[in-house]
């Protein structure tokens, strides 16, 4: 009894008596000694042992329920931003139409209409004269054959005689205005005067000419003779100059014709070479593996040479055309002289020292 009196002060800190539900939730079975002490009205000699520890209580709270027990409550879910937005009507209205909006058609918009009116653009129809039928290369080549065009134009030009040249020179002198009206007659004035006298003499009959000569004195006849000799000399010099100019023009024409003809031949040969190269590429087994090539270079090596050309103010000179004609002929023959001729052309024409 003394022991009970000593511990009486600490009974208020003792764990309260558990209810029947707590005992059922606890898996621990009561100890035999405790039951015996309880039946004997014990517990007087020590503290009553706790039925469950804290860990056991936690495990009991989160354990799955038995098949016969009541269904558990709905598990608690954390509230996130996504779960809040799923129930938001404004957010759903915005996201439902996202990606389904059609792009703006710029051509049919009102802004584009105003833009076109500001630019004032008008469609221009392509004229039929600018449309070429390039289906047939041969026909196009014949249409653009500069050599035949030039030759046909040359054949149509009539050849002038010496008398016609003289008459044209006289007409040019007569039609040309006098730049200065000086008292001293210039050479053109004297030539025009003599030409007029010659024309009057031609028009006059033979009888009137003889009568006029008979009336002249010896001094007047000598003066007329000197004037005629001077006119003949001047006309002869002018005729020689015009004939030399005609020879130069004919030579230039021949050089241009030969250049154009060689250029067309090289272009045709280059086209044939390209077609042959395409056919060779299609073949699986080339013929070059069966035999050796006797030439030091592959056929068509110099045929595709690119000739540099610097565009000047005027047309190329006759000397330049002659050099280019030599290079084109060597290219047509696929000759090994092409590099040397090309070097001379670059040093003499493009980069003269």
Curated annotation (Swiss-Prot):
Annotated GO biological process: axon guidance; negative regulation of autophagosome assembly; nervous system development; signal transduction
Name of the protein this chain belongs to: Fasciculation and elongation protein zeta-2
Tissue specificity statement from the Swiss-Prot or TrEMBL entry: Expressed in nonneural tissues, such as heart, lung, spleen, muscle, testis, placenta and melanocytes.
Coiled-coil zones: 214-286
Species name: Homo sapiens (Human)
CC terms in the record's Gene Ontology section: axon; cytoplasm
Region feature (Disordered): 19-49, 271-300
Biased segments, Low complexity type: 28-38
Residues with PTM Phosphoserine: 135, 176, 195
Family stated for the protein in its record: Belongs to the zygin family.
Keywords: Coiled coil, Disulfide bond, Phosphoprotein
One protein family per Pfam: FEZ
Role noted for this protein: Involved in axonal outgrowth and fasciculation.
């Amino acid at each position: 009894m003394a022991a009970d009196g000593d511990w009486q002060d600490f009974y208020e800190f003792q764990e309260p008596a558990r209810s029947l539900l707590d005992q059922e939730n606890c898996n621990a079975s009561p100890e035999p000694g405790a039951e015996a002490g309880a039946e004997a009205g014990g517990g007087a000699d020590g503290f009553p042992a706790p039925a469950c520890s804290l860990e056991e209580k936690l495990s009991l709270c989160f354990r799955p329920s038995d098949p016969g027990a009541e269904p558990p409550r709905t598990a608690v879910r954390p509230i996130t931003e996504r779960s809040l937005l799923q129930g938001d009507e404004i957010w759903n209205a915005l996201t439902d139409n996202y990606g389904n909006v059609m792009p703006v058609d710029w051509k049919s918009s009102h802004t584009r209409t105003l833009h076109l009116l500001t630019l004032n653009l008008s469609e221009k129809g392509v004229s039929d004269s600018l449309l070429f039928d390039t289906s047939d290369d041969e026909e196009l080549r014949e249409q653009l054959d500069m050599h035949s065009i030039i030759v046909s134009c040359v054949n149509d030009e009539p050849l002038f005689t010496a008398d016609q040249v003289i008459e044209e020179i006289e007409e040019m002198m007569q039609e040309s205005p006098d730049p200065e009206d000086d008292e001293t007659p210039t050479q053109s004035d004297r030539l025009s005067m003599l030409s007029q006298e010659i024309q009057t003499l031609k028009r006059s009959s033979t009888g009137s000419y003889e009568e006029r000569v008979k009336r002249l004195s010896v001094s007047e006849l000598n003066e007329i003779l000197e004037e005629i000799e001077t006119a003949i000399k001047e006309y002869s010099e002018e005729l020689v100059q015009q004939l030399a100019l005609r020879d130069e023009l004919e030579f230039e024409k021949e050089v241009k014709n030969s250049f154009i003809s060689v250029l067309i031949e090289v272009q045709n040969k280059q086209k044939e070479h390209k077609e042959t190269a395409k056919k060779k590429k299609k073949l699986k087994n080339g013929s070059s593996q069966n035999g050796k090539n006797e030439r030091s270079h592959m056929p068509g090596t110099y045929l595709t040479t690119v000739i540099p050309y610097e565009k000047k103010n005027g047309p190329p000179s006759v000397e330049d055309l002659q050099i280019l004609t030599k290079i084109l002929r060597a290219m047509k023959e696929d000759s090994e002289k092409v590099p040397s001729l090309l070097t001379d052309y670059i040093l003499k024409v493009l980069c003269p020292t």
